[in-house]
UniProtKB/Swiss-Prot annotation:
It comes from the Viruses. This is Uncharacterized protein 096R. InterPro entries: DUF5875. It comes from Frog virus 3 (isolate Goorha) (FV-3). Pfam families: DUF5875.
Length: 223
């Protein structure tokens, strides 16, 4: 899949585009290094998949105003700029639609339809248990598991795109996961998480001062 991905990306950014928009050349050069790790390749494809999924419709001249930030090259690409500079916009659209298909983005030409999040957590849990050997993985293995990172990206994409109602999702987490959380986390931390989720569920504003202490604790714990 990586070779297809790179080939399509290269065809989308021919030398004429790279000369006028140098960030394209820098991006391609960093992705084409001979010793690029599989982890980096997976990370790049997952990021592009999430970007396309979150910014549909994709192709046919419809490109988002926000740029794609590559986790590997560090470059920010604006595909609207690429389209403007490309000598054949129809060919570019074809290549980028092909990229969406190769990456497995569903309904890439349509805006996402919001659905109820009821049962979403159960679906995610089922996908987690489909990962080979997940039940016997150590914490280090779980943290480095590419499939789990991709699944987390999908959940984030579903929320950001509006495919999942964040208020319903927060309510579902409260209904399904608070019990197990209380068994794993100190009472103070769990109470803080519950308070944040309840505010999201009820449509109330959540301040950064409420969220940052929780994030910091998880980071200190190695998450």
């Amino acid at each position: 899949m990586w070779s297809q991905f790179i080939a399509i990306l290269s065809q989308s950014m021919p030398i004429g585009v790279c000369r006028k928009y140098p960030v394209c050349q820098t991006h391609l050069k960093k992705l084409k290094v001979a010793d690029l790790s599989q982890e980096s390749k997976d990370s790049e494809m997952a990021a592009m998949t999430e970007y396309i999924s979150s910014n549909r419709p994709w192709g046919q001249g419809s490109y988002p105003s926000n740029g794609y930030v590559s986790p590997v090259s560090g470059c920010t690409l604006h595909f609207g700029n690429v389209s403007t500079l490309h000598p054949d916009s129809a060919a570019l659209d074809g290549r980028l639609r092909e990229m969406a298909e190769v990456l497995g983005v569903q309904d890439y030409a349509s805006a996402p339809v919001r659905v109820s999040s009821t049962g979403y957590i159960d679906k995610v849990k089922a996908m987690v248990y489909e990962i080979d050997g997940v039940e016997s993985m150590s914490m280090a293995d779980l943290m480095g598991c590419t499939q789990l990172h991709q699944l987390a990206g999908k959940v984030a994409s579903d929320i950001q795109s509006g495919a999942i109602n964040h208020r319903e999702f927060a309510g579902e987490i409260l209904s399904n996961m608070v019990g197990p959380l209380r068994e794993l986390l100190p009472k103070e931390d769990c109470d803080s998480i519950v308070s944040i989720l309840e505010k999201v569920r009820d449509g109330e504003a959540v301040s950064a001062d409420e969220v940052f202490p929780i994030i910091t604790k998880f980071q200190e714990a190695g998450f």
